[in-house]
């Protein structure tokens, strides 16, 4: 499948300069003033190569730096038209090409891909209506629920600011942060089981974690969470095996997927949503906007809607995997809205912003990020996935900047009334095209529009959240935060899995340098299960001094929700 419309060239390949003209000398020969003399400034072939080499690296991702990926195909097997008017979810049998990138979260690009860490699983679907992204993880929950904590949390997962050692040598700051922010306990309980070390990228699941809101043509809201489940089932490595591979084969997962696809295998995933009405959300035991909680499947069963098939390796890692840019803003296409999840709201800004820093202001014009319906002349080729198959040409008023590949040619950069410059606007449900924003907007038209928006907002907020003013708020910790991870440890993990969980925690926490933090780790797990805390204390060689949640919060100055 040729996503980018690239023609298969059969012409001879000639070594050339960047301007396209052939270079007649040996590529390895520099130009000297005389044999064994100094090189000449006029050797522009040498200068061009050195200058290019000096600029080869772009900043690596601040998170999810280590990764790999491939091309894919999405197919809609079951319509979601009853809960959303989003175009890709309407017609059974709809297919589109795409790209997926798998990654770890905390490590740099050279770290092992079998490390105990969540896995990022990000999808980009090249639909006829534009690019649609899913930016997921392989865990259904996360370490935090307030966006303000995300930068400092990531700092704690990186290298120590003084020693510059990472958590393979020193885990003090890692556990210091987690135990002072115990809403992390659900993610930690998940991650320090063998679920934290998947056997391969093709045999692990992916979850949105966040709640999104799907809207149907009647304007009815439905909360959803996405699940992408491996067709072969979830397979894991033991902690010891993952650690061994970290040393012997740090690119294990990347190599395994590349080999699978090279050998003709096509791993498959099944796509589901959980759905929750706003009325159900009011009765739900937890907040629908809490990223540290799951929706129980008994109450909110999975509903299948599609499949994803991994189809082939990319042609060039840097061009298609390193330069690909995902964002949850691309999840929120017409028919899908973001929820009030604080972390999701912040990601809507952070993801595009970090790509502008990493790749440049025009990163969405790069071939791997360019929408099919952009109408860019450089997208044309013999592919079935070019702009000609799209229902409309995408146009906006964003112009210029560094490395602008496609600047919309003669299209005006404002709403114009000039001949042959007609610009149409689609309604929210994508059914109608009109000139509704042409000309002068009267006050009464604005007032009607604002009143309708306010009514919709008040209606939705009344159902789930009371209408609130702005205020500063610290999420407290409460017994509710331990219910789901306790059930995971006590009811889902069998005896052998519990032993492995203790082993994994102790092997990691034994690298803590500060005795106070090491002691707090035992109390942290003691809040989950007292016997668990006691066993970990014995294994770490620290006194077991159990405390209840209130005592823990007071001792370590943690905000309590009580």
Swiss-Prot record:
It holds the Pfam family Catalase-rel. One of its GO terms (biological process) is response to hydrogen peroxide. This is one of two catalases in S.cerevisiae; the other is catalase A, which is the peroxisomal form. Present with 319 molecules/cell in log phase SD medium. The active site is at residues 64, 137. InterPro entries: Catalase, Catalase_AS, Catalase_clade1/3, Catalase_core, Catalase_haem_BS, Catalase_immune_responsive, Catalase_sf. GO terms for cellular component: cytoplasm; mitochondrion; peroxisome. SUPFAM superfamilies: Heme-dependent catalase-like (SSF56634). This is Catalase T. The keyword Transferase does not apply. Belongs to the catalase family. It comes from the Eukaryota. It is found in: Cytoplasm. Its EC number is 1.11.1.6. Its cofactor is heme. Keywords: Cytoplasm, Heme, Hydrogen peroxide, Iron, Metal-binding, Oxidoreductase, Peroxidase. Homotetramer. GO terms for molecular function: catalase activity; heme binding; metal ion binding. Occurs in almost all aerobically respiring organisms and serves to protect cells from the toxic effects of hydrogen peroxide. It catalyses: 2 H2O2 = O2 + 2 H2O. Heme binds at residue 351. PROSITE patterns: CATALASE_1 (PS00437), CATALASE_2 (PS00438), CATALASE_3 (PS51402). It comes from Saccharomyces cerevisiae (strain ATCC 204508 / S288c) (Baker's yeast).
